[in-house]
């Protein structure tokens, strides 16, 4: 699992996402943070139980977060490489896809409750609850996601020689200029999966078995 790999993939295949760069060197990371013409977020590249993203209030906090990961050992090996990227304004949503090569089924959009404090404040958690369908993901938003995120992503996987079969979690930020990718996961969302499973009318096990065997019926 690597957010740095994901960022490079998104750039390579022109999938909308936040501006940003990957760093293993603290001096270069600090220079980027201080020169960035926008507020930034700091992400540990590896797995961190949904808690590896720091949303600083200012550049001083951003530099401190970068140092904690690259020099202080925060998140262990997962923090040895970081992603510094533009803080996007908008509302997040989770899009789960059942993918079989160039075919896919999109499950209802969902949202989870991340912040630990009342009124959506405080540090991020791994998710403390979820609901679906998410009203913020309108038809227009989902059409945008299909055309500008999913299509180039699946084309990119094919170009990389990856016959992807399974769940693809696309975390998006719905901004004024369209949906942008926050993250990819190759699993169901947690806790989003708990509210999505009851909404799947077909047999989930049969669906997953079909995908594993390369015969997804997109009309299911």
Go through each PLM region and give its residues:
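Peripheral (often C-terminal) accessory segments that flank ATP-dependent C-N-forming ligase machineries
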Residues: 210-220
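Conserved N-proximal alpha/beta basic substrate-recognition cap immediately N-terminal to
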Residues: 1-17, 24-35, 40-41
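Conserved beta3 strand of the protein kinase N-lobe
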Residues: 20-22, 95
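Conserved anion/nucleotide-ligand pocket segment
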Residues: 37-59, 196
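C-terminal catalytic subdomain
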Residues: 199-212
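Internal nucleotide-binding/catalytic subdomain
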Residues: 52-193
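Conserved aromatic
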Residues: 23-24, 56
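Residues within well-ordered alpha-helical secondary structure of globular protein domains
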Residues: 35, 68-71, 210
């Amino acid at each position: 699992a690597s957010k740095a790999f994901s960022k490079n993939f998104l750039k390579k295949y022109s999938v909308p996402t936040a501006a940003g760069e990957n760093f293993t060197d603290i001096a270069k990371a600090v220079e980027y943070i201080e020169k960035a013409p926008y507020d930034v977020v700091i992400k540990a590249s590896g797995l961190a139980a949904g808690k590896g993203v720091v949303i600083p209030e200012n550049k001083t906090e951003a530099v401190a977060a970068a140092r904690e990961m690259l020099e202080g050992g925060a998140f262990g090996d997962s923090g040895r490489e970081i992603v510094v990227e533009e803080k996007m304004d908008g509302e997040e949503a989770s899009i789960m896809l059942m993918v079989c090569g160039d075919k896919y089924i999109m499950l209802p959009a969902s949202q989870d409750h991340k912040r630990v404090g009342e009124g959506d404040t405080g540090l991020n958690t791994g998710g403390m609850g979820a609901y679906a369908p998410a009203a913020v993901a309108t038809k227009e938003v989902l059409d945008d996601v299909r055309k500008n995120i999913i299509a180039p992503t699946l084309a990119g996987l094919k170009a990389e020689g990856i016959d992807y079969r399974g769940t693809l979690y696309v975390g998006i930020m719905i901004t004024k200029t369209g949906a942008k990718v926050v993250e990819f996961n190759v699993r169901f969302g947690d806790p989003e999966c708990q509210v999505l499973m009851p909404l799947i009318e077909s047999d989930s096990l049969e669906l997953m078995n079909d995908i594993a065997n390369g015969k997804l019926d997109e009309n299911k």
